[in-house]
Amino acid sequence: MLPPKHLSATKPKKSWAPNLYELDSDLTKEPDVIIGEGPTDSEFFHQRFRNLIYVEFVGPRKTLIKLRNLCLDWLQPETRTKEEIIELLVLEQYLTIIPEKLKPWVRAKKPENCEKLVTLLENYKEMYQPEDDNNSDVTSDDDMTRNRRESSPPHSVHSFSGDRDWDRRGRSRDMEPRDRWSHTRNPRSRMPQRDLSLPVVAKTSFEMDRDDDRDSRAYESRSQDAESYQNVVDLAEDRKPHNTIQDNMENYRKLLSLGVQLAEDDGHSHMTQGHSSRSKRSAYPSTSRGLKTMPEAKKSTHRRGICEDESSHGVIMEKFIKDVSRSSKSGRARESSDRSQRFPRMSDDNWKDISLNKRESVIQQRVYEGNAFRGGFRFNSTLVSRKRVLERKRRYHFDTDGKGSIHDQKGCPRKKPFECGSEMRKAMSMSSLSSLSSPSFTESQPIDFGAMPYVCDECGRSFSVISEFVEHQIMHTRENLYEYGESFIHSVAVSEVQKSQVGGKRFECKDCGETFNKSAALAEHRKIHARGYLVECKNQECEEAFMPSPTFSELQKIYGKDKFYECRVCKETFLHSSALIEHQKIHFGDDKDNEREHERERERGETFRPSPALNEFQKMYGKEKMYECKVCGETFLHSSSLKEHQKIHTRGNPFENKGKVCEETFIPGQSLKRRQKTYNKEKLYDFTDGRDAFMQSSELSEHQKIHSRKNLFEGRGYEKSVIHSGPFTESQKSHTITRPLESDEDEKAFTISSNPYENQKIPTKENVYEAKSYERSVIHSLASVEAQKSHSVAGPSKPKVMAESTIQSFDAINHQRVRAGGNTSEGREYNRSVIHSLVASKPPRSHNGNELVESNEKGESSIYISDLNDKRQKIPARENPCEGGSKNRNYEDSVIQSVSRAKPQKSVPGEGSGEFKKDGEFSVPSSNVREYQKARAKKKYIEHRSNETSVIHSLPFGEQTFRPRGMLYECQECGECFAHSSDLTEHQKIHDREKPSGSRNYEWSVIRSLAPTDPQTSYAQEQYAKEQARNKCKEFRQFFATSEDLNTNQKIYDQEKSHGEESQGENTDGEETHSEETHGQETIEDPVIQSSDMEDPQKDDPDDKIYECEDCGLGFVDLTDLTDHQKVHSRKCLVDSREYTHSVIHTHSISEYQRDYTGEQLYECPKCGESFIHSSFLFEHQRIHEQDQLYSMKGCDDGFIALLPMKPRRNRAAERNPALAGSAIRCLLCGQGFIHSSALNEHMRLHREDDLLEQSQMVEEAIIPGLALTEFQRSQTEERLFECAVCGESFVNPAELADHVTVHKNEPYEYGSSYTHTSFLTEPLKGAIPFYECKDCGKSFIHSTVLTKHKELHLEEEEEEDEAAAAAAAAAQEVEANVHVPQVVLRIQGSNVEAAEPEVEAAEPEVEAAEPEVEAAEPNGEAEGPDGEAAEPIGEAGQPNGEAEQPNGDADEPDGAGIEDPEERAEEPEGKAEEPEGDADEPDGVGIEDPEEGEDQEIQVEEPYYDCHECTETFTSSTAFGEHLKTHASMIIFEPADAFGECSGYIERASTSTGGANQADEKYFKCDVCGQLFNDRLSLARHQNTHTG
């Protein structure tokens, strides 16, 4: 190989990696010299080539190109020969594979080529002198310290040879070429030509320093040996204990491999002084002071471990973190005295002390130069440059801010976000101090290459190979990796290192210490802590919610200085300013709103809105747990989820679990927004109880709706009414709520009212619920309804008798209802009189009369209500609920039960009203009570009765244009309230899909009725006729779709009642009269329940003309409305009032009563469970049941008509009766099941024709699974215009029929026009069944083509038989010239008996052929024998019994015995002809004696004929007969029969007079359904159509 001088001379401008010696000296002298001109540049590329990291996002092709370029730059093929390149590569690889214990020694010898290396290895034992090597090592530190500024050029060809970087991956370093190349490098180039390894250069220089300044050993005379020794030390750094210079070069090599150029703030480059702006800097302008990257490194900044935002401050690369930080960290221990064999061997304490003492001198300026690479150096010129390089490298890591070296041996005292971690800095500083500390001390230390130079500071474990040590350090790095992660989040190289070290976890939670791979994961994790804090804050009712968030320093470390924005309100941080702006919108204007809200809530004693901070806290964390259920405490992210959840409580029993009513079941949602909206508005109108001023009356109404919707009373002390009416007098402002007792003993009834006077006068009884007070007395009215529904089904367990006065407000009533339902299921009946303040147009006819009478048995106070129907029921009016309550624990206010609580009344009471009668409780506010309330209120108003009774009014008197709470629409199902009916309508659609509205336990399941009364037989006789008609309307629970209708209707009722009161005083109509008469005897103390509809009579304009419905008493302002309404009553409704005693689920609240006439509630059809939001829809729907007799039921004598539902609901009947749900439509008369409604329709028509069906017994329930109920109804009632000719199913439009016909096209059979397969009675055909039957032999085939081919066989057989018969006849004629023996081929079609074969009648007297069942008819018509036996003319063959046996069973005779009329054959089925001897197929004419007979027979037989069993026609040819048969039926009904060929019990035969219709039922076709027999198939098919419709 050529010497390095030659190589460098040929290519002086191709080097980039600097000579360590010239690096410092030349940069100071010639700062503008350009690097990249010398062979040492090849070492840089060599290191890059050997340590290039594959990064996926760069791509494989680019990586390959990069590798090729680096290899070319390293090997420089344009300046070197192939032999040199090969020698270089082989030597490098050889040095890699030699034993570890030989590597230091071999490197010290610096073999120039492979031959020299082999020689060294052969003479290893003789040449090995560890003492000399150790001594040569000792002097490095001192020399390096003294001569670091000297810059002497390398003086040995081998100066760069031995310095090879051998990392743990076993990368070889060719030392010889590097020595040569570096030797030829002149000082001017500043980068001595090295082979491919820059470490060789440095080591050579350091070796020379050792030779000059130490004890002048053999290395002093032989600098190459010293250099080679250093090379050995460096080379063995990875594997064995040796000089720390190798560590330094190892680290430098790894930096170079990452494309990093090191520079220092003072302008001294790490490896090239001043190269920050020259040399490769010029080639790579992206590099500058500090640690800079090559262009390719810059392109993949993440890959090479360079922080995006801190390129000017420094970077930690992957390799550097692994090998440098941990190795340098171990330098402290590695330099310890117990490992004195190591080159600068000294104890940790010693070198620490020394390093601290020398800070002021050289170490102070270059204190970290040797540190990062664990280097102790011999002192000479090359060592100085080496140390400068190392110093700059360290300064890059530890003095990035340019403020000088940091002298703390533990590392930089202040942490920078962009510096490496303290562990690394500490390790590097310790190693630098150790390597630079005490050269004199290290000189005395011998070097032992077998020692373990790498010692772990954490656990004290030592390693001989740096790779093992680094791997070990990785385990400890996991503990401190998060520190790195804070500063180098964006560095891919660092992230890769961290992943390899700690599994990718580099973000640590400050709360629990958990680490995460991604910052997003950490953010999500922190939310958990935040939520926990939120819950804690809620529990502690804290006003300010703490927002745990990353600190500014953390954010700076993670995202950089400019990558976070903090919200000053909640301290939440964001990466983007836009996110912060969006977030701050949450806080905008909340403070004022919250202040107002809290003030109002405090006035009312309630705080339902959280503090702003807590509210913001909830919003910040994704609104999680924002909606909380007050029943069970569960929280939800969305209000809809909470609503769904609350249904569970309302259905089951919201009070069972907690033992109390929900403290607050307010569902945040639209109503919350509206509530906030109303509170946020400027309010000028005085709201007496709420102490709010409203700008507009509508706002006051909205506010009142809020109060009436949700009563949140924190304690008993809050005596504000929920229902507020500004214009009312103070006496009228009776805001009565029903509040629970804390114990059963406290049974005093009182009314909580804003008027203390009224409170004293008319206290309402508080309900005891589980002996627990209810802090909030009212749940959502809807929730209550649902609870009532669910509990009503359960039925009451022995209820605890409780009653309460029936003075309730909007939600109070609902609340009572809810608890009525819930308490009943819990075994307690709260016998409170639920008197709704809505108009009752007529006295309710319910069982309430009896119930109230019996309620008096247990309670002394009972409201005597006109609705209680009988003047005989005029129980003394409740004297004073207060008295009653004080006198009797079981004080049971009269409970007025209305029609509206049909379901609850039926189910909640359990067995019926009887139990309620005993307890005197009616859990549902009644429309009867409403009537009474209205009547009493108006009466009292007219009579100016004193305000001794508490009055509830939900609507104001006077000229107010608004109706408080009138616009509030509440959902029965979940309690949600809506300001617009359209919102409620949309909302109710959800419930329509979710659950059945009805229950099997309800005979009558109409949810609401316009009229508040129920038909009752106990009603006064004089009012009964009129009431019965009105009850119809009431039972229908007519509602109006819009709030305008509500107000209008309510106004009608109010005016109606008011005018009645004005004119009659007590009598408006029969209803009013009765109501007033009933209640006229009540004392003044009776609580006057003034309904929401009880408007000031003076309010009603005389001009307002009311049009009253004569049938139901409903009033309309517009005549057209009345006309439309009367259409409902256009038909006669047969209503058994007793059937509807429990017909309606109670309404929710006063506003609900108002809405009873607005159509906002659901009306349920008791027959099919269909629910409707308007009563007219129910009427129209029920008309279907009434008109369609198939759908009538015995228990439903009324025929309420209804439109189709606005939204089809699930089949309630099917849900109530799962056994029927899976079945098809089934006829209850005959049990026949049908898949299609049309089939049932046709089938039922048969029953009607036969008068077998009565309307009450037809169908209990017809269920069509899979089809909409409305579709079924339509199919039952609409005229069928288009009928399928195949199966008979009919359709409304041709499109449906066309779709249906396509079904039959794919079926494997053909339908005849009159054919319906009997299997359709139950289910359609599912298998491939033979449908094509051969008329000749009875065989059946699936396809008609097969049948055609089969018939061809029969034709061939017929021809053969004809020929055979002709031949036989000819033979017979030969025997008897005068006697012709005709041969006949008989075709028996459709028979299960095989075709008869030609037979020759025996001419001899002893042979005679006859059919077994058919009498043998002689040609001349003679019949001998009393039993019709067949005899020959001369009687020769006659037997005593006249029978001739036919052994082979053939039925055909040549004499025409089988050619007899069908009638004759039928008449003589038993006739048999015997054949004593001969077989029937004897060819000879034995037995044939009479020629005339033979002639006659021949004439008869020569032309055979075929009988058609269906039309009795006869055919002479089989083809004609076959064609004729096709005319009867193109399809044979296939049914199992006893014999092959039978079809529907029919045996088809075509025979001659002697042929075989010999069985009685051969001619009959049997119906499989009813067993009836028919003469022909056509009749059977027609009959079967009657079964299938």
Swiss-Prot record:
Residues 128-230, 266-306, 319-349, 588-610, 838-930, 1056-1104, 1396-1496 are annotated as: Disordered. One of its GO terms (molecular function) is zinc ion binding. Residues 1398-1418 are annotated as: 3 X 7 AA repeat of P-E-V-E-A-A-E. Residues 46-128 form the SCAN box domain. GO terms for biological process: apoptotic process; regulation of transcription by RNA polymerase II. SUPFAM superfamilies: beta-beta-alpha zinc fingers, Retrovirus capsid dimerization domain-like. It is found in: Nucleus; Cytoplasm. Sequence repeats lie at residues 1398-1404, 1405-1411, 1412-1418, 1419-1423, 1426-1430, 1433-1437, 1440-1444. The keyword DNA-binding does not apply. SMART domains: SCAN, ZnF_C2H2. Belongs to the krueppel C2H2-type zinc-finger protein family. Induces apoptosis in cooperation with SIAH1A. Acts as a mediator between p53/TP53 and BAX in a neuronal death pathway that is activated by DNA damage. Acts synergistically with TRAF2 and inhibits TNF induced apoptosis through activation of NF-kappa-B. This is Paternally-expressed gene 3 protein. The lineage of its organism: Eukaryota, Metazoa, Chordata, Craniata, Vertebrata. The gene is PEG3.
